[in-house]
Design a protein with these regions (language model features):
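Beta-propeller-forming repeat regions
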Residues: 1-137
Length: 137
């Protein structure tokens, strides 16, 4: 709905995890072993990556073990377990980016969010600064 209460699109979208994945400055959606891109112009989502042979946690919510800027290129990686829970897997975007941004772990609110995600409240970390499509980095 918009600010007037008008319905903009009647289809329900994923609202599970946001993740910086594909190289632009918009967040993608991480939900049930898939990274999804929301095309706001077309009003639909499409799959960027299907994570194979892995398991997420908490059945209905489907949380990864961790999603964060682990490797330091500002885009976030996905840490999960395999189906047998015998190994950890780190999924990394292979999509090129032209943006050069400081490692998100250097931002204190982001780092605290990663610690909270990893130790209790499993929600994606947020930066302490505005990070969006029109940002100039």
């Amino acid at each position: 709905r918009n600010v007037k209460g008008d319905i903009l699109n009647g289809r329900v979208r994923s609202t599970n995890f946001g993740i910086w994945w594909d190289g632009d400055l918009l967040r993608e959606l991480l939900d049930h072993e898939r990274v999804l891109k929301y095309d706001w112009k077309a009003g639909r989502t499409y799959t960027l990556m299907q994570l194979k042979n892995c398991k997420f946690n908490n059945g209905t919510k489907s949380n990864p073990c961790l999603s964060a800027d682990i490797l330091g290129d500002w885009r976030e990686e996905i840490l999960t377990r395999d189906e047998a829970s015998s190994e950890l897997r780190l999924y990394v975007s292979t999509i090129p980016t032209t943006h050069r941004i400081t490692c998100l772990e250097e931002d204190i609110p982001y780092r605290l969010g990663v610690a909270a995600e990893n130790s209790g409240y499993n929600q994606p970390p947020e930066t302490g600064f505005y990070f969006g499509a029109e940002s100039k980095f």
